[in-house]
Amino acid sequence: MVQRSKSSANWLREHFNDPFVKQAQKDGYRSRASYKLLEIQEKDRLIRPGMSVIDLGAAPGGWSQVTSRLIGGQGRLIASDILEMDSIPDVTFIQGDFTQDEVLQQILDAVGDSHVDLVISDMAPNMSGTPEVDMPRAMFLCELALDLATRVLKPGGDFLIKIFQGEGFDMYLKDVRTKFDKVQMRKPSSSRDRSREQYLLGKGFKGA
């Protein structure tokens, strides 16, 4: 029998005792992350019926489930992740590594000649536990997501992204502020207290 590490056992215990995990199972959401987006939605009303949205780092689909329900049948949702994701009705899913040009091009092709109202990203790299390694990886994903957002957002569009406090954060925040009318930070109650993750919200894209 494989022996689990102490940290792995602690994670499993925390996971199964987590009220948001239990609530997600009850409500039919694929992950506890759904409640992070729902809480931000409650405060900021980002997602509205009929919107066009891109969801990065979508698997297993918690944010896509919430977004699809809120935009309704007249909306359009393009989701992408390096991992597989079970299909969701009316959601276009692109599987692949977002850091690769061909995957970016697939997303751009799916958007087509139109633009989108909102880009959301819950992407995070596989964490090693070493900040000197993890932060550059995380910030690289954030930079790529912002680059995509500036290509596909309509003027006035919004951008929501998971970000971690650490090296590169201040410069990134400064960059986002040059591109959006209003920038705010959000820390949903469903985000674990010990997690360094926050969500950066850029509202009112100024245009490319």
UniProtKB/Swiss-Prot annotation:
GO MF term set: rRNA (uridine-2'-O-)-methyltransferase activity
Main location class: cytoplasm
Residues that, per the record, bind S-adenosyl-L-methionine: 61, 63, 81, 97, 122
Position of the signal peptide: none
Active site annotation, chain numbering: 162 (proton acceptor)
Reaction equations catalysed: uridine(2552) in 23S rRNA + S-adenosyl-L-methionine = 2'-O-methyluridine(2552) in 23S rRNA + S-adenosyl-L-homocysteine + H(+)
Keywords from the named record: Cytoplasm, Methyltransferase, rRNA processing, S-adenosyl-L-methionine, Transferase
Name of the protein described by the UniProt record: Ribosomal RNA large subunit methyltransferase E
Naturally occurring in which organism (per UniProt): Pseudomonas putida (strain W619)
Lineage of the species this protein comes from: Bacteria, Pseudomonadati, Pseudomonadota, Gammaproteobacteria, Pseudomonadales
This protein's encoding gene: rlmE
